[in-house]
């Protein structure tokens, strides 16, 4: 355990207690009083809403035109089959989408293990029941798998050309999150003579496509990334962009193409040898308005895009361009 300059305790590394293959407890201590609820609530919300995963988003079933179609020899109605498909636990090793198929001859039970997969896709709950065939009939499906996070209703993912979509393509509400349940508790902890400290205990259950430790680590990374922007309050001077880690802020080394300006604005800047964001922010409004074919509308666009990144025109940079940045707009 270490203590920072302002005497705020830094907790030890997390302790992992695996309860089952899909459930574990993560313990973090010691924490300053009140930090248990602060961190526990934040981690719980991120774990439930923002951990990426895979889900079945679209289904085509031979002979089924819509969700209310009746299928001869199928015990369940189509809506129930779609609900069962939403609970299939899927993991992909690479890529963001895939199309799988399922074919089964009845009578008998159809499970997730009947889905045909390749080396890139795993089904973690193969015994999960999808439907029952009561007669000597076959069922054939095509399943679209996509990567995402959180919960996305079907209506939110319908494309503008929805009216022309193929008849029989059923769009599902998708729950991408691999985290099924998260609860946390704050218990008392002590260090030497201090007895007013917190111990955070997170109880997390997943669908098996990710282990609890990795889920908590991912949630912590997301929180850390979101909070990192507040560091600028301390380290950035209002009139100048300060280098990070005794170097140049990586954002300033990004090409102006990353700003996604209109083609007209981008071409005007490049014609004036403005290739990097660092080149651009050192220009004043007056200087840019002197650029041929760049008017007030383009200037407004540039200012708005920079403001979204916490930057502005007329900023001062020391030692620009840094070593490795060539005048022709390529990193050396």
From Swiss-Prot:
Gene Ontology molecular function, alphabetical: DNA binding; DNA-directed RNA polymerase activity; protein dimerization activity
Location of region: Alpha C-terminal domain (alpha-CTD): 248-332
A single Gene Ontology CC term: DNA-directed RNA polymerase complex
UniProtKB keywords: DNA-directed RNA polymerase, Nucleotidyltransferase, Transcription, Transferase
One Pfam family matching this protein: RNA_pol_L
Stretches the record annotates as Alpha N-terminal domain (alpha-NTD): 1-234
Uppermost EC category: transferase
UniProt xrefs under SMART domains: RPOLD
Biological process annotations from GO: DNA-templated transcription
EC id: 2.7.7.6
Catalytic activity: RNA(n) + a ribonucleoside 5'-triphosphate = RNA(n+1) + diphosphate
UniProt-listed InterPro entries: DNA-dir_RNA_pol_insert (IPR011262), DNA-dir_RNA_pol_RpoA/D/Rpb3 (IPR011263), DNA-dir_RpoA (IPR011773), RBP11-like (IPR036603), RNAP_asu_C (IPR011260), RNApol_insert_sf (IPR036643)
Family: Belongs to the RNA polymerase alpha chain family.
Subunit structure: Homodimer. The RNAP catalytic core consists of 2 alpha, 1 beta, 1 beta' and 1 omega subunit. When a sigma factor is associated with the core the holoenzyme is formed, which can initiate transcription.
Domain comment in the entry: The N-terminal domain is essential for RNAP assembly and basal transcription, whereas the C-terminal domain is involved in interaction with transcriptional regulators and with upstream promoter elements.
Role played: DNA-dependent RNA polymerase catalyzes the transcription of DNA into RNA using the four ribonucleoside triphosphates as substrates.
Protein name (record): DNA-directed RNA polymerase subunit alpha
Species assigned in the record: Stenotrophomonas maltophilia (strain K279a)
Gene name in the database record: rpoA
